[in-house]
Amino acid sequence: MTKRISAKHKIDRRLKINLWGRPKSPFNKRDYGPGQHGQGRKGKPSDYGIQLQAKQKLKGYYGNINERQFRNIYKKATMLKGDTGENLIGLLERRLDSVVYRARFSTTVFSARQLINHGHVRVNGKKVNIGSYVVKEEDIIEIRDKSKQLAIIDIALASKERETPEYINLDEKNKKVTFVRTPKFDEVPYPVIMEPNLVIEYYSR
């Protein structure tokens, strides 16, 4: 098991939830956190604890984004017009690693980030190797020609675990997608309950 997969499973156990809805999640086998104290007694969580859990779930889902980067995304969301929670989700879904994952070019957000880091992805014909790159509406994201035969991409596309959401237009044959529009929160196909309002409360303390 690679360090990346091990870390992903650890996130599931730490948050006590099958975060990505994967059938092989270790949380399907045990409902307690990692480590020798994972089976300890559970007290009633505080408001702070509930808000923190909501933040950790959202951070974890998008590839365990580090705290500094996630806080910066939140700050950007507060400066945009409209609902801050909707803005936060929109910014997260516009990350290039999120789009590659939603396009089903990868089975996880982590492997999407790897594809990008290794130069396999093009945005409007240009190489972009930063997973946090923010795409715009009508941007075309595609796998570069030399990488279109990669088995990991074909395996991901063949998987029936997920469907491509409506705000991404997939050309599966050419391994290309168009980012049609920024989605609303209720359009995002989360396999678990996400609560961006609690994340906003956490940072507003």
From Swiss-Prot:
NCBIfam families: PRK05327.1, rpsD_bact. Signal peptide: none annotated. The gene is rpsD. HAMAP family: Ribosomal_uS4_B. Residues 94-154 form the S4 RNA-binding domain. The keyword RNA-binding applies. SMART domains: Ribosomal_S4 (SM01390), S4 (SM00363). One of the primary rRNA binding proteins, it binds directly to 16S rRNA where it nucleates assembly of the body of the 30S subunit. With S5 and S12 plays an important role in translational accuracy. Belongs to the universal ribosomal protein uS4 family. Residues 21-47 are annotated as: Disordered. Keywords: Ribonucleoprotein, Ribosomal protein, RNA-binding, rRNA-binding. Coiled coil: none annotated. Pfam families: Ribosomal_S4, S4. SUPFAM superfamilies: Alpha-L RNA-binding motif (SSF55174). GO terms for biological process: ribosomal small subunit biogenesis; translation. This is Small ribosomal subunit protein uS4. InterPro entries: Ribosomal_uS4, Ribosomal_uS4_bac-type, Ribosomal_uS4_CS, Ribosomal_uS4_N, S4_RNA-bd, S4_RNA-bd_sf. It comes from the Bacteria. CDD domains: S4. One of its GO terms (molecular function) is structural constituent of ribosome. GO terms for cellular component: small ribosomal subunit. Part of the 30S ribosomal subunit. Contacts protein S5. The interaction surface between S4 and S5 is involved in control of translational fidelity.
